[in-house]
Curated annotation (Swiss-Prot):
Stored Gene3D superfamilies: 3.30.70.860, YajQ-like, domain 2
Gene Ontology CC terms, in alphabetical order: cytosol
UniProt family annotation: Belongs to the YajQ family.
Organism: Azoarcus sp. (strain BH72)
Pfam families xrefs: DUF520 (PF04461)
A GO molecular-function descriptor: nucleotide binding
Biological role: Nucleotide-binding protein.
Protein name, entry field: Nucleotide-binding protein azo2183
Record keywords: Nucleotide-binding
InterPro entries in the cross-refs: DUF520, UPF0234-like_C, UPF0234_N, YajQ-like_sf
Length: 161
């Protein structure tokens, strides 16, 4: 029975590279000279440090296009609240979401069941396995999920016949 997996992955070297390039651009910009503006990446958590909310917005305006250039989907980012740090400094934590979380997986399974396509969907950890009788039905399922789920980057892989 043909099947495929729906996952959500982030290319970590590309993510680290885009953060490094953004940091070098921030260091070279005249309006950031003498400030504490920088971006840190630890595991799946980016932290933006700056002197004001405006600086954080400017840093995002540098970082997001760099991520797009490196083919890192910016929809995987989940922004936290801006926090005041010592003095007049601010920071913002940005989570890099990897894997299909349970709520999204349930939404995908419900979407496929309600569509009346002859496929079975099962949640397997941080992925959703979809299997069906024919390859054409699986392609319809992929098209349906791509059309309906647009707020989170999904990859379709591990095809088996």
């Amino acid at each position: 029975m043909p099947s495929f997996d729906i996952t959500s992955e982030v290319d970590e070297p590309s993510l680290r590279n885009s953060v490094d390039v953004a940091n070098s651009k921030i260091a070279g910009r005249h309006d950031f000279k003498g400030t504490s503006a920088n971006v840190e990446l630890k595991e799946k958590l980016m932290t933006l440090y700056g002197d004001s909310d405006f600086q954080l917005d400017q840093m995002k305006a540098i970082l997001l296009p760099e991520m797009t250039k490196k083919k890192v989907d910016v929809r995987c980012l989940e922004y936290g609240d801006v926090q005041k740090v010592s003095g007049n400094k601010v920071k913002q934590e940005v989570k890099v979401r990897v894997g299909v979380d349970q709520d999204l997986a349930k939404k995908i399974v419900k979407l496929l069941k309600d569509s009346k396509l002859k496929v079975q969907a099962a949640i397997q950890g941080d992925a959703v396995r979809v299997s069906g009788a024919k390859r054409d039905v699986l392609q319809e399922a992929i098209a349906l999920v791509k059309k309906q789920i647009t707020d989170f980057p999904l990859q379709f892989g591990n095809f088996r016949d």
